[in-house]
Amino acid sequence: MNKKSIRDVDLKGKRVFCRVDFNVPMKEGKITDETRIRAALPTIQYLVEQGAKVILASHLGRPKGQVVEEMRLTPVAARLGELLGKDVKKADEAFGPVAQEMVAAMNEGDVLVLENVRFYAGEEKNDAELAKEFAALADIFVNDAFGAAHRAHASTAGIADYLPAVSGLLMEKELDVLGKALSNPERPFTAIIGGAKVKDKIGVIRHLLDKVDNLIIGGGLAYTFVKALGHEIGLSLCEDDKIELAKEFMQLAKEKGVNFYMPVDVVITEEFSETATTKIVGIDSIPSNWEGVDIGPKTREIYADVIKNSKLVVWNGPMGVFEMTPFAEGTKAVGQALADAEDTYSVIGGGDSAAAVEKFGMADKMSHISTGGGASLEFMEGKELPGVVCLNDK
């Protein structure tokens, strides 16, 4: 990575404004999944060990520029203190006199959590005045929030206009892993693209067709490709306005020598429920009032075989409606194939794919699980991320 990280700067005694991603799911004031807090620990611990005064900023939920009591970061600060094994202070503001006073009272190695930055309307507008207020608290800006790196907000990008700006360890790792996958991949390189909609994945499919040896398609978006081949798809998801594009992608794959894999059989149903009756049919045999909801067993075998023979696999998007047991087998099979493939480096592109490997207890078998759904998708589309562009070059 050609951006400076916290390893490249002197931190002792410095006030560090560190943007983290503590946007964790909450239920009745309790954190239900603390993965994102744990992901930030190495950076926070490094800053503490280096004798920095660690000022943490994050958003939580979508308060839309207003104070929403349930979205305060107080429970997060409390849990962070437990995980760090030290006293973590919490400010009820994200800038201004109260925050400044608390920062002024900090000693080297102290940790302070600021209030939810999205309580202020200027955050999502990347307001320069708000960015200046944040910058006034600190000597150095550290961005460790890869999950928000695709957003040009005051605390992720704007603040870098007023302070030296470097990446944290999590951000550095994300950029290294994803950057290497796209610029210098080990081969065979396979991308697995799933999820519901073609329109969400157009950019990533187009960009990856220039990079990969194999492209595997699954999930709801597969049926647009199936229809593009002239097959009936019953009530399956389809974007009729993307059929021509699907044809174009298949033609492009052929021209570029990319092996393009699509389902050969699918799981179909007449209803969405945990007790739904399902059938397995060939891809050209979906009845008119049934809907495709997962890849079938033959497809799972083919996909697993491609995975096993790949050196690098990037996975973005599930193979079916994995949240429901009858439609989860395809996604589970892809996860299992990745877990079993010992010579394969697996990169899970955040969002639903990350949720799936967590759900099936396979997370520890994956080489890298990205902490950013939207950010990793935009990175894989070849877009520049505002939260990265703003960092100082080495």
Curated annotation (Swiss-Prot):
Q: In which pathway does it act?
A: Carbohydrate degradation; glycolysis; pyruvate from D-glyceraldehyde 3-phosphate: step 2/5
SUPFAM superfamilies, per database record: Phosphoglycerate kinase
Binding residues annotated for ATP, in chain numbering: K201, G292, E323, G350, G351, D352, S353
Q: Could you tell me which residues carry Phosphoserine?
A: S183
Any one GO molecular-function label of the UniProt entry: ADP binding
Name any one Pfam family assigned in the record.
PGK
Q: How is this protein organized at the quaternary level?
A: Monomer.
* Identification of the protein by name: Phosphoglycerate kinase
What does the record give as the organism's lineage? Bacteria, Bacillati, Bacillota, Bacilli, Bacillales
The gene for this chain is pgk
